[in-house]
Design a protein with these regions (language model features):
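Short active-site oxyanion
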Residues: 1, 32-36, 65-67, 107-112
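Acidic, PIN/NYN-like endoribonuclease modules and their adjacent C-terminal/linker elements
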Residues: 1-3, 103, 107-136
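Short, well-structured N-terminal submotif of metal-dependent ribonuclease cores
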Residues: 1-38, 48-61
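Short beta-strand scaffold positions
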Residues: 6, 38, 71, 114-115
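Conserved glycosyltransferase catalytic-site signature
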Residues: 8, 40, 96-100
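A generic structural signal for short hydrophobic patches within well-formed alpha-helices
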Residues: 11-12, 43-46, 120
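Amphipathic alpha-helical recognition patches that constitute DNA-binding helices
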Residues: 25, 97, 101, 119
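Active-site neighborhoods of divalent-metal-dependent phosphate/nucleic-acid chemistry enzymes
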Residues: 68-114
Length: 136
């Protein structure tokens, strides 16, 4: 099974137990002990939405149970900028530069992204980014 990098949008649905397709897929991947990775921008985005410090600690513990695909400094930031430019050159705008950074890490790690954020679909149209299919 390929490596999957769940975006913060998928983790947020998961922590809310929302029943959203990305929540259900993440539950399945966790139950199947799929190869999941996490990256610093996802940790930051998820923890920023914590309701309290104790909630942040619980979420952090859950997230960091998975291997960390670290951001490789300037290289990944430059790749993220190139991703945003490629999308813009293709006539589409990526709303979040953070999503470009997450995509840069996923591409480098050959990981597919599980998400509920349209930016990743746009990025995948203009780069080598793979999207993890829901219900896979």
């Amino acid at each position: 099974m390929p490596i999957v990098l769940p975006d913060s949008s998928a983790w947020i649905e998961y922590f809310r137990a929302s029943g959203h397709p990305s929540d259900l897929e993440l539950v399945d991947l966790i139950d199947e002990e799929a190869e999941l990775v996490i990256t610093e921008p996802v940790v930051m985005e998820v923890l920023a939405g914590a309701r309290s410090e104790s909630h942040a600690i619980k979420m952090r513990t859950a997230l960091l149970a998975y291997p960390l695909a670290k951001v490789f400094g300037l290289d990944d930031y430059e790749t993220a900028a190139a991703i945003r430019r490629a999308c813009r050159a293709g006539g589409e705008t990526v709303r979040s530069t953070m999503d470009c950074l997450i995509a840069a890490v996923a591409i480098r790690e050959s990981a597919s992204v599980l998400h509920s954020d349209r930016d990743f679909d746009v990025i995948a149209q203009h780069t080598e980014l793979h999207i993890h299919p829901l219900g896979a």
